[in-house]
Structures are given as C-alpha cells and as structure tokens.
Regions:
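C-terminal segment of classical bacterial N-terminal signal peptides
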Residues: 2-9
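Start-of-domain marker
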Residues: 11-68
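Beta-strand-rich domain onsets/edges
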Residues: 11-30, 114-177, 181-190, 198-203
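Short amphipathic beta-strand segments in non-cytosolic proteins
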Residues: 53-63, 191-209
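Glycine-centered loop-to-beta-strand initiation motif
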Residues: 72-75, 206-216
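Short, hydrophobic beta-strand segments
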Residues: 76-81
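Exposed beta-strand face motif in extracellular beta-rich ectodomains
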Residues: 82-86
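Short acidic/polar inter-strand loop motif in beta-rich domains
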Residues: 92-101
Length: 216
C-alpha cells in the first residue's frame, strides 16, 4: 500500500515522489521518480535544477543532496549501502498560475476547504479575474534499505507532513500517523486529502482532519 497525503495544490495535478521499489534489494540503487499527474497516474519528470529549490535525502542523521544531472530520469538514482530508513525531500522553485475567472479558483478553495479564502482575497483589494497565484510544491517519501529502522523529522519546509509511523517496522494495524506543520507550528483542524494505492494499483481517495496537535 502507498499513501500520499496532500493539503495544498492549487492546480488539478499533484506532484509526488514515487519509486518502483521502496525496499530496493542489496546492491541496487535507490531510484526516486518525480511524478506529476492525478491518482498516481502521471508523467515521470526529468530533473532540472532551475525547477528545484532543494532535493535531498537523510539516513541515520546524515543529510546528502541529490546530485542529478540535467534531464535525468528518474530524478534521483543513488547507491546507498547503509541500512536504515531513508527520507527523501523535494521542494520546487516557485511557479505562477493565472486565473482568468473566479469560478476555477472557487472550485479549488471549495475542494480544499478554505472557506475564508474569498473574503481574504477581496479584503486585500484583489480582482476576481485575471489574478495570479505563486505556489511551491513540497513532497517527501520514505524508503527502506535493509532493516529500515529510523524515523522522519521536521525539515523546516513551509508546510510538511512528518511521519510518526515507520511503515517498514511499525505495526500498521493501528494505522499510519503523521503530523502536519505550517511554518513553525502544527496545523490544527486542517483537511487532509489522502490517496491510497493498493498493490494492484487501485486508488481510493478520502479525507481526514488533523486534531488540535496537527496529527492525522
């Protein structure tokens, strides 16, 4: 089973870090694909440094930047021999999206449960059409080498999920737990959209809300 948790994406397509092997056997490289699409179906993006603000992995407390070449597919292909949990983190450079009508943006804010967005928009004196949005994309994934022991941590992204469950060593009968952060604080009572993919590739989407401590 593969889970993707999402809270902010102002466009129809999501971005996620994927892999053909989240538990690669000994001697094989850890390969991470940068995917863009919907419901786990999408294009495998090439690596371009002008689209990447930061791209790194951490294992056993040691951080390493991904040093891919322009146009590389997959975006990350690294030989990692040490055992343990590998946390891969990606942040894009900013992109600009123009809305020519309010309706398209309204669909987004309704879907993402931002009820105060219109009031905030108009109170700033912004127009209801022809306005622009700047957005970043953030994505993390967990890979296991060998025993897969280890834990996720907060890397200081503007918004991020921090896994509180290690899916490779913890009992998943109790579920997978994560904590959502925005800035330096847990984000409470936020809608979380979850995409769940089973081993056969079937995808189910459902919604949860974070608690008072940002946990879901």
């Amino acid at each position: 089973m593969f889970l993707k948790l999402q809270i902010i994406s102002a466009h129809a397509h999501e971005l996620w870090l994927d892999s053909k092997q989240f538990q690669p056997p000994e001697g094989e490289k850890v390969e991470i694909e940068l995917r863009n699409g919907q419901n786990f179906k999408g294009i495998n993006l090439s690596y371009f440094n002008n689209r990447t603000k930061q791209f790194f992995w951490m294992q056993n407390g040691a951080r390493q930047d991904v040093r891919s070449r322009l146009g590389d597919v997959p975006a990350m292909s690294v030989a990692i021999d040490d055992e343990g949990l590998i946390v891969v983190v990606y942040e894009s450079t900013p992109s600009i999206l123009t809305y020519n009508s309010w309706e398209k943006f309204a669909n987004f804010i309704n879907h993402k449960d931002f009820p105060d967005a219109k009031n905030s928009h108009t109170n700033r004196g912004l127009p209801l059409k022809g306005f622009k949005e700047q957005y970043h994309r953030y994505s993390k994934t967990l890979v296991a080498r060998g025993h897969g022991k280890g834990s996720d941590r907060n890397f200081g992204l503007e918004t991020e999920f921090v896994a509180q469950t290690n899916p490779y060593v913890d009992d998943l009968e109790a579920g997978f737990r994560a904590q959502l952060w925005y800035g330096k604080k847990p984000r409470k009572n936020a809608q979380v959209e979850i995409f769940e993919r089973d081993p056969e590739g079937a995808v189910v989407t459902f919604y949860l809300r974070t608690d008072l401590h940002g946990r879901v």
